[in-house]
UniProtKB/Swiss-Prot annotation:
The protein's name in its UniProt record: Translation initiation factor IF-2
Keywords linked to the UniProt accession: Cytoplasm, GTP-binding, Initiation factor, Nucleotide-binding, Protein biosynthesis
Stretches for region Disordered: 54-350, 364-420
Gene name as annotated: infB
Organism: Microcystis aeruginosa (strain NIES-843 / IAM M-2473)
Functional note: One of the essential components for the initiation of protein synthesis. Protects formylmethionyl-tRNA from spontaneous hydrolysis and promotes its binding to the 30S ribosomal subunits. Also involved in the hydrolysis of GTP during the formation of the 70S ribosomal complex.
Biased composition (Low complexity): 378-389
Region ranges (G4): 615-618
Region ranges (G1): 511-518
Amino acid sequence: MSNTKVRIYDLSKELNLDNKDILDICDQLNIEYKSHSSTISEEDAQRIKAIAAKGLASSTSKNSTGQRESASPAEEKKQKILALHKHNRPETGEEGESYPGQAGSSAKPTLISPPRPPVKPLVAPPGRDEAAEKTPPTAAEMLSHSPSVKETPTETPLVPEAAPTLIAPPNRPSLTPKPRPETASGRPEPRSKNAPGSNDRPRGEKRERGESENAPSPERRVGLAKPEKPTLNRKPDGKSPKLAEPAREVRETVELKRPVRPGLPAKISATSEEETDTTKKSGVDGTEIDTDTGLLGADGPKKLKRPTMPPRMAKKSTWEEEEEEEKKAAKTAKTAGKNKRRTQALFEDDDDLESELSGLINTPSFTLSTARPPKPPTAKAAPPGTPTAVKVKRPSKPTAHTGSPKSERQEPQEEKRPESIVVTGSLTVRDLSELMKVPETEIIRTLFFKGMAVNITQTLDVDTIEMIARDFEIAVETPSTQSAAIKTTEMIDVSDWESLQRRPPVVTIMGHVDHGKTTLLDSIRKTKVAQGEAGGITQHIGAYHVDVEHNGKPEQIVFLDTPGHEAFTAMRARGARVTDIAVLVVAADDGVQPQTKEAISHARAAEVPIVVAINKVDKPSANPDRIKQELTEQGLVAEDWGGETIMVPVSALRGENLDNLLEMILLVAEVEELVANPDRLAKGTVIEANLDRTKGPVATLLVQNGTLRVGDSIVAGSVFGKIRAMIDDRGQKVEAATPSFAVEILGLSDVPAAGDEFDVYESEKEARSIADQRAIERRNTRLQQALSSRRVSLSTLSIQAQEGQLKELNLILKADVQGSVEAILGALKQLPQNEVQIRVLLASPGEITETDVDLAAASGAVVVGFNTTLASGARASADREGVDIRDYNIIYKLLDDIQGAMEGLLDPEEVEEHLGFAEVRAVFTVGRGAVAGCYVQSGKLVRNRFLRVRRGKEIVYQGVLDSLKRMKEDAREVATGFECGVGVSKFNDWKEGDIIEAYEMVMKRRTLSS
């Protein structure tokens, strides 16, 4: 046995005691050890077990006698001795329990059942909830306890402080569930001690038992305790030995406080579970709490020191840590540091005050506080200012750090300037500053030094933006504009692949103006469309289908005729985007022209095959080989020259070789494998749109996939409609339109924009919601474009208007179709507007109405109509209001007249007009002055006109010709080849050989300068 070694902590587990308890016993027996992990001999272990067993036996005997003979005065005296424990709430709870135990035997079992749950609360805060749940069964006991509590103070007059203490602990437990957050720290306890007036025996018992069970565990911290708190506890009683026992229980309290630390909960729970086992055993005897007290009594004095100090130590350690942190923070922020020091001083004073109060009120206050969860909201605590001080400190630290985050947030704002920016159009000063990461003030200052006064909302053009960017060393990139002919939407979905069928090809006829596109189409259709076009030029897209035979089978080809005039670029691009094959018409006598090149670029952008029709080969001046050469320069090499481009010479007027052209078109269509799914909802493109005075909004749609039917809910761009009727290219009503066919539909709510794509939806509600959403987006885009297109701000506009520098021509534009409106607006933008700006107040398809006239009268605008009519009453209203209405059917004349109107707004300029030359051949002195005898070499001399006297290369005089005489008679003018006398009142220094140049200043109408 002597060789066997036992570790102290193993022994403590075996005895269900704390390591400190075992170490105390080792001190009493003079057993050497270093720590709780030291080993001792088996003999020493047996000695320790014996002493521990004696301590348990004595405590149990005392408690059992105290409970059974509570009525005898002798036993009461023993309880008075124990009453010193009453400083500790656990003991008062015990006495309270003894009385109810006598009152009714039936209450005892109920007493035993509640004590077990209370043990768990000691381990961790969640345990209390369980205890609180089990407390209700002891309601009867609570009623019986209340009188017993009153008896206790009367029976124990020897202990003046004990009596109030006994009352306080029960009240404290009763309040525990509510103030549970408050009691996380030991400070709030003094308040609760004064407050208790209710007697919650069951909860008090739980508190006492928990404390007694945890009594051994606090020994760990007791060794660190300072003697200050024990002395405070001794002062109230004056009996140091008796106070030892309460101190023991205080240790318990300290142990309970451990759960406050996040790192220790696991260990504490383990020890508390062991302690619960011991309490359960003692509870069966009915001497549960007395047993613990006996153990505590053995180590009384030491334990008094231990319990009191641990809370102090915990506070002090945290306070010291906070002080160190404050000192560090003070280095960075002096002001914040001063505030923290003040709060620290308050904290220290409150700490001392709280420790004194805890000593006067008795250690049980610490017990209750330590048993409760940590970090309570101490807002309710009136006497102790400590919690408040701590709270003040904590926020102060963050505030010290808050400065840094602000600076960090400000730093990223200073973003690096980009090396290059992408500019697609005009930008406001604010938008440019965001793009360049440069303050607006810098941009405004830069422009101001360059002589341009701008404000933050003013729009800058691309040239100005490039100039500003150069000053800030930023490159400006202008992205290449995407061709409008590029096909952006794939009309065939994956779901259509299983149901695809062949469809007719859509062929677009393109070429330069007057090269015979519409005549060629007329010859193919055997109609006379070209004769109906104003001026013989096509002014909007026409869609027609032609039935032809190919390989003995009937085939169909859908033709789109596009305008060739330069103003209709958008229409040509739109035609190329929806087409399958492009037929390029080139006049054999004219060659490749600008619109021919443009048509080639559109077809290439749309990635469609090109078939060239060389027209007018019947003319004597036709030279097809020259055309092929010019097309080769554009990258189109004829097949007979070794290329891949099909070129067919035709005569549209005579209808020569048209069958060959159609054959080539169908061959190309076969190679392209054009397919669509007719068994689905239709989708396609708006070819043209207009507002008809009788039909309302009308749109020409090209169905590219699916089948369009009457009654379908359609969304074209941002316009909703339900198809009421469909009309084909020959004026016949149809019920359905299959892929590749163009139809005119009625039933739209508004005029859609040409080029918009349309979709058919099953649900009218869904279609309406999509249309509304798109309308909002389009409105916002339009407003943004209107703002960005402002060339001047309102401030500069008013200044220029006052000074007469700004001229504006207000226009209201009405046309037959949407495409014509686009073309006219595009052409107007090409006019120079440096001195006169064009403001289009309204541009829409439809007839000219009285509303348009009223708008023109209010704004001083000119109403321009193109291929449209006047509504009833519009002409009379215009005459009454004095509004000028101009109607055109050829775009050339429209543009010429608008340019003339713009020039008419310009102030006429004074121009020098040459009159003639004369040579001085003699000088005559007349009175004080001199007169020059001259010979008119060219032109004429006119009196009261301007003249210059040139002597060699110098101009000697410049003034007015005052006197002109011929043969001593005044003459108004002298023509070439005649002699005359010239007199000038302010010039007499004539010399022979001088040249007189006569001129006059005339007012001349200005032209627009680009």
